[in-house]
């Protein structure tokens, strides 16, 4: 473990490193563009007009702030579980309602920021990669709003399992390109987007969907998502007059988690949990890079990756297309090694149960991604005392998953 | 330190001609055939041999090279076997320089120091690692120089005069100019633009400048060779290889010659060019 820094919020360093993680591992063709982007973002970040613009669109276009909702029936259920095992606890569980954002997930927070930066840079063509399709939908939406050309790369496997989102992207005027190479999922979509970017670098802006990729993406995406944690802080003050005691979020690349966590990293009283996808189980096919991987270099950054002994990237598996990625954002790798954040995992089955539990108890159908976080809440909350305040990031709504989950449940009823 | 690459370019200069540089994926379609092919390349006229180290996620490669990497991985190719293959090639061939080309992760996982020691011992002369820009020189470039291997960097149309000195700072052996912004196997740049770009790079360095991406024919190779110190051909050779495979993607009796014959034709194109303008 590294020696603990004064602040967990000061990274990355000037070269984009969080400890040994992060950096800029990309082809030379892209380097000048990445340096331009870093400059443009540094200027935008310090520009009051940019911040004002973003605040305006957040409020009136995305519908922020998203509510912080006390999940009363879920809390009662978890207290019953606690009582049944003789513990007499059960944390108060709050949901940060990112699923109520326009387009249905937290992804839009990041895309808004990046599209405003792209506009400042004069870019007219936007490319993106997507797994579950939520990032693609958010990108297609803001491209429509600002009149920009939009091309979205999506693994052919994901095109099949997230059809509602493919239809949405096309309705919004985006071109969806099914990627047939490799394992035909999110990592291959990212490779294909990088190939497009290398080819069309003169007019194209690559809108990355999570806190990964070459510097400055992990930092920039984190900054745009930190609105989640900033709001949560203020809302919890208002609701309970103090900070939450714990935070929990699912991790694909880790952007919704980073957004919730970052504003709280220096508050040592706040326990923080990230939940990776354990797929069929940690000893079988899964997507838990921190638990089952080790540091390596892919997609422009050094981070924990699933790979074999020869450094070849391994297939990830999750029921949830948005978590089905063999890597994780570099800042999470660093938070893992420093021990500030505890990383857990949830299997496909656990996520499916949590999906149904939240739907039935609260009338909120969560995204399968978010259901991974709920799955660990079901264990953690009953162990905590009744005055413990727990915030779960509800990163997205489950509309996109209704056909997939419906098929699975129908299959089981037979 | 003089490497095989330096020696080769000095010889070519004396002969008054440009280099013919071949690229193939190591282990494609299987390790034994791949070794037979690279053994045939010097006789076919290759002046420098580049060998790809297969990687599951080759972000800068087009479909032909991606498929070649898949075939090699499926046939069991690893970093260790790639080095072994070069070791075997070196048993009969001491002068043709070999450059390994690939992505960083397999090298990082093998271990940088161990990789450099083993590569040097196997008879490797230079490295091209696509995803290590000068900003990450401390990872591999500097240790490679210390180990006596050339670290060859790509310069591209987006590498402007302001950035070129940074790109060239720790480059040795030669500069590889990628004539287009794009992936391997894309359309070629026109030779006039290439000539101007080579001249621009030569204002910043005395290193030889080789040009690649999109060269498919003997004519095109001649055009590039006239305006540079070397023409690099990859995807066209990989396509010739894959065109010779059977329905299962396995090597046939034609495979080695399919590659060697195309290499010989391309070499003739390069040799018919005038020496690059000094
Ligand atoms: C609803 C939802 N939550 C979470 C994720 C995972 O992304 P990240 O880990 O970057 O938040 C996705 C990705 O598609 C998503 O759609």
From Swiss-Prot, chain B:
One Pfam entry name: Trp_syntA
Reaction equation(s) it catalyzes: (1S,2R)-1-C-(indol-3-yl)glycerol 3-phosphate + L-serine = D-glyceraldehyde 3-phosphate + L-tryptophan + H2O
Molecular-function annotations in GO: tryptophan synthase activity
UniProt xrefs under Gene3D superfamilies: Aldolase class I
Pathway membership, UniProt: Amino-acid biosynthesis; L-tryptophan biosynthesis; L-tryptophan from chorismate: step 5/5
Keyword Lyase: yes
Gene Ontology cellular-component terms listed: cytosol
SUPFAM superfamilies named in the record: Ribulose-phoshate binding barrel
Coiled-coil parts of chain: none
Catalytic residues of the enzyme: 50, 61
E.C. number: 4.2.1.20
Enzymatic class: lyase
Keyword tags: Amino-acid biosynthesis, Aromatic amino acid biosynthesis, Lyase, Tryptophan biosynthesis
Purpose: The alpha subunit is responsible for the aldol cleavage of indoleglycerol phosphate to indole and glyceraldehyde 3-phosphate.
Subunit record text: Tetramer of two alpha and two beta chains.
Membership in a protein family: Belongs to the TrpA family.
Cited NCBIfam families: trpA (TIGR00262)
Protein name, as recorded: Tryptophan synthase alpha chain
């Amino acid at each position: 473990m590294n020696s603990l820094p004064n602040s967990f919020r000061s990274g990355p360093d000037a070269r984009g490193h969080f400890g040994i993680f992060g950096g800029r591992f990309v082809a030379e063709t892209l380097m000048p563009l990445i340096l331009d982007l870093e400059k443009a973002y540094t200027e935008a970040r310090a520009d009051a007009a940019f911040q004002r613009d973003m605040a305006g669109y957040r409020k009136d276009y995305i519908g922020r702030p998203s509510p912080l909702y006390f999940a009363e029936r879920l809390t009662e259920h978890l207290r019953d579980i606690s009582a049944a095992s003789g513990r007499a606890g059960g944390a108060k569980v709050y949901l940060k309602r990112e699923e109520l954002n326009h387009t249905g997930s937290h992804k839009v927070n990041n895309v808004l920021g990046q599209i405003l930066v792209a506009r400042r840079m004069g870019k007219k063509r936007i490319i993106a990669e997507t797994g579950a399709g939520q990032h693609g939908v958010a990108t297609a939406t803001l491209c429509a709003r600002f009149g920009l050309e939009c091309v979205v790369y999506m693994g052919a496997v994901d095109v099949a399992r997230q059809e509602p989102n493919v239809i949405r992207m096309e309705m919004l005027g985006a071109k969806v390109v099914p990627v047939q190479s490799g394992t035909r999922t999110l990592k291959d979509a990212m490779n294909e987007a990088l190939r497009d970017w290398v080819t069309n670098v003169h007019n194209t802006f690559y809108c990355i969907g999570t806190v990964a990729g070459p510097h400055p993406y992990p930092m920039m995406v984190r900054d745009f998502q930190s609105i989640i944690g900033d709001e949560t802080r203020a809302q919890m003050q208002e609701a309970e007059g103090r900070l939450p005691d714990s935070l929990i979020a699912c991790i694909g690349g880790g952007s919704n988690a980073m957004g919730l966590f970052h504003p709280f990293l220096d508050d040592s009283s706040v326990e923080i949990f990230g939940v990776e996808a354990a797929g069929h189980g940690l000893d079988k096919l899964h997507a838990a890079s921190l638990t089952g991987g080790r540091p390596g270099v892919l997609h422009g950054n050094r981070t924990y990756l699933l790979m074999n002994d020869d450094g070849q990237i391994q297939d990830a598996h999750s029921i949830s297309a948005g978590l089905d990625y063999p890597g994780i954002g570099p800042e999470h790798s660093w938070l893992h090694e420093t021990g500030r954040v505890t990383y857990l995992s949830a299997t496909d089955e656990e996520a499916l149960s949590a999906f149904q539990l939240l739907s039935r108890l609260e009338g909120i159908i969560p995204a399968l991604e978010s259901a991974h976080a709920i799955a660990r809440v079901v264990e953690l909350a009953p162990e905590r005392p009744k005055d413990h305040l727990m915030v779960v990031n509800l990163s997205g709504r489950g509309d996109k998953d209704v056909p997939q989950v419906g098929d699975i449940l129908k299959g089981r009823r037979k | 330190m003089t490497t095989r690459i330096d020696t080769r370019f000095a010889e070519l200069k004396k002969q008054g001609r440009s280099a013919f540089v071949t690229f193939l994926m190591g282990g494609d379609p299987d390790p034994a055939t791949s070794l037979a092919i690279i053994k045939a390349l010097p006789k076919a006229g290759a002046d420098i041999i580049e060998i790809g180290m297969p990687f599951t996620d080759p972000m800068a490669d087009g479909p032909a090279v991606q498929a070649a990497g898949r075939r090699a991985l499926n046939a069991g190719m690893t970093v260790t076997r790639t080095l072994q293959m070069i070791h075997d090639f070196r048993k009969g061939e001491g002068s043709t320089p070999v450059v390994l080309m690939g992505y960083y992760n397999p090298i990082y996982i093998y271990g940088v120091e161990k990789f450099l020691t083993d590569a040097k011992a196997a008879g490797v002369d230079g490295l091209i690692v696509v995803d290590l820009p000068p900003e990450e020189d401390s990872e591999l470039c500097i240790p490679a120089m210390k180990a006596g291997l050339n670290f060859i960097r790509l310069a591209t149309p987006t590498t402007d005069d302001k950035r070129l000195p940074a790109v060239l700072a720790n480059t040795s052996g030669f500069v590889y100019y990628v004539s287009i912004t794009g992936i391997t196997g894309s359309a070629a740049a026109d030779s006039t633009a290439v000539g101007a770009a080579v001249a621009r790079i030569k204002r910043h360095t005395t290193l030889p400048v080789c040009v690649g991406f999109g060269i498919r024919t003997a004519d095109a190779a001649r055009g590039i060779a006239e305006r540079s110190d070397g023409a690099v051909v990859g995807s066209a050779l990989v396509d010739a290889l894959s065109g010779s495979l059977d329905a299962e993607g396995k090597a046939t009796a034609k495979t080695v010659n399919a590659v060697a014959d195309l290499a010989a034709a391309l070499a003739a194109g390069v040799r018919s060019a005038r020496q690059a303008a000094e």
